[in-house]
């Protein structure tokens, strides 16, 4: 399958092992059985910016004595809820073995109360209110909760979908946990085309979600890893996923623990790309833009800073 133009396909596939993919009407991309507005060249209705951004911990972990978490964004919009990553999900908590042996390294707590689904319910919403999930990448600690939102459209770079689903290498087949998407999510792939955004050359506004959600390709950690920028009103939040692990990467005041540096190297798909994107992130951090907050997926201090200043 090839990258789509980011518009969801309403037709379900019969094989649950293959995520449903958006189409634009070409032979390899079309949705079988019915036309969509994207096939007819009809532009999607414009949607407004996010209303509120919540910062959730969806997975407490303890790797070799280092406290970590899964930093997830919950974005309220006029058209429903949007998640940036999901952390661990309910099925992960019920069956920890499904995330693989690496759980013995990260040592997740697997608390159902920390899942995005349960926290959304605590906020007074239903899981069906989640319309879109934007993934930084397909690692198990980022996508474990997607099965808790089966009707949400799952946005990802086409490169990441290729590496995880369509044409994974041997290393990628060992890395990803296919059971986490066995329910057949509605996959929306986004190609490499885009426009400049704060020093990054090819950012893609996700207009089908809203005017304030931007997918920023940052390959290196995985084949198609991306950051996600969200307009929170008084500032932009740039969720860098696993483009870096620790706040020490941003400045020299804090030393990145050896375990995290080793893990970063071990898990990187392309170290040169990873270093290049980290250099861009550091440069952006040093500008001290007052309307920008940079966070990553696993640093507890950056997570707390985001919550304290939300």
UniProtKB/Swiss-Prot annotation:
Binding annotation for Zn(2+) 2: 141-142, 242, 288
First-tier enzyme category under EC: hydrolase
Keywords: Hydrolase, Metal-binding, Zinc
Pfam families listed in its UniProt record: Lactamase_B (PF00753)
UniProt: Zn(2+) 1 binding residues: 137, 139, 221, 242
Signal sequence interval, chain numbering: none
Alphabetical list of InterPro entries matching this protein: MBL_superfamily_lactonases, Metallo-B-lactamas, RibonucZ/Hydroxyglut_hydro
Cofactor remark from the record: Binds 2 Zn(2+) ions per subunit.
EC nos: 3.-.-.-
Cofactor: Zn(2+)
Region (Disordered): 1-29
Domain of life of the source: Bacteria
Protein family (similarity comment): Belongs to the metallo-beta-lactamase superfamily.
Protein name: Probable metallo-hydrolase Rv2300c
Classification of source organism: Bacteria, Bacillati, Actinomycetota, Actinomycetes, Mycobacteriales
């Amino acid at each position: 399958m090839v990258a789509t133009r980011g518009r969801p396909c309403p037709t379900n596939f019969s094989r649950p092992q293959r995520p449903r993919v958006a189409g634009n009407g070409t032979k390899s991309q079309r949705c079988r059985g019915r036309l969509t507005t994207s096939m007819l060249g009809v532009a999607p209705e414009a949607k407004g910016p996010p209303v509120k951004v919540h910062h959730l911990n969806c997975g407490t972990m303890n790797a070799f004595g280092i406290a970590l978490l899964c930093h997830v964004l919950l974005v309220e919009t006029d058209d429903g809820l949007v998640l940036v990553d999901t952390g661990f999900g309910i099925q992960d908590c019920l069956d920890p073995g499904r995330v693989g042996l690496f759980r013995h390294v990260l040592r997740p707590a697997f608390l159902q109360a920390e899942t995005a689904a349960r926290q959304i319910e605590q906020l007074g919403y239903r899981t069906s209110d989640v319309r879109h999930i934007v993934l930084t990448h397909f690692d198990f600690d980022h996508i474990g909760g997607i099965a808790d939102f089966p009707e949400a459209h799952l946005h990802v770079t086409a490169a990441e979908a290729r590496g995880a689903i369509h044409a994974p290498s041997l290393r990628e087949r060992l890395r990803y946990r296919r059971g986490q998407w066995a329910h057949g999510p509605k996959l929306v792939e986004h190609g490499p085309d885009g426009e400049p955004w704060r020093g990054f050359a090819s950012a893609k506004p996700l207009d089908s979600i809203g005017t304030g959600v931007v997918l920023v390709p940052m390959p290196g950690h995985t084949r198609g890893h991306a950051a996600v920028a969200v307009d929170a009103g008084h500032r932009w939040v740039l969720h860098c996923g696993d483009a870096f692990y620790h706040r020490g990467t941003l400045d020299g005041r804090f030393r990145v623990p050896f375990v995290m540096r080793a893990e970063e190297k071990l898990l990187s798909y392309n170290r040169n790309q990873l270093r290049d994107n980290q250099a861009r992130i550091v440069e952006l951090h040093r500008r001290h833009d007052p309307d920008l907050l940079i966070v990553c997926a696993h640093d507890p201090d950056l997570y707390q800073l985001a919550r304290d200043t939300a």
